[in-house]
Amino acid sequence: MRITRLSASVALLFGAALFAACGDDHAPTQPTSDTQLEAARAATEKYQDLSRALADGYVEAKIVMQQMGHHYLNASLLDDKFEPDKPEILVYAPENGRMKLVAVEYAVPLDKSASAPDGFAGSADAWSANTKYGLWTLHAWLYQDNPAGVFNATNQRIQLDPGTLEGMRVDPMVH
C-alpha cells in the first residue's frame, strides 16, 4: 500500500511538471505571408467601391498598364515602411461598366531604401526597382486570381480594352 501511494505521488508530481512545461507560451508568433495577405484583404475590402478609395485619399495616377490596370495612388502613405494593411497603390480594371479592384501594390521610394524592402514573410514576394517612377514596387493580386502567382507584377487575366484608355498614359513598361 505504501508503494502504491508513493508511485501515485510520483506520477502526480511528474504529471504536474509535464503539464506546467506544456503551458501556454506567450511569446509573439511571427506573421506568415498568409496572415499578412489576410490583413491586407481585410483593410482594403472597402476599396472594392472606388468612391471609398477616392474619399480616403487615393487619386488616379493616370498610369494604365496592360496586364495590370489603372493605378490609384495615396501619396500620403509613401514612406520607407512596408505595412501590409496600408498599400500605397490600388489597382483597378474595368469590368461590366465599373472599376473592379484587382490588386494592391506596395511602393517605397528608391531614395528611402537602397535595397528591396522587407515585405511579406517568406521569400515568395519579389520587389521590383522601378527607376522610371523612383519606386520599389510589389503587387499582391488579392481580388483577381493570377496564374503566375499572387506577387507577380503582371496578370495575364487583365486585358484592357483600348477604348477604355482614352485620356490615359498607357505605359507598356512592366514595373
Report each predicted region and the residues it spans.
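Primary mode marks residue(s) on the alpha4-beta5-alpha5 output face of response regulator receiver
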Residues: A27-H175
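Bacterial N-terminal signal peptides that target proteins for export
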Residues: M1-V10
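Bacterial signal peptide processing site
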Residues: G23-D25
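C-terminal motif of bacterial Sec signal peptides marking the signal peptidase cleavage site
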Residues: L18-A21
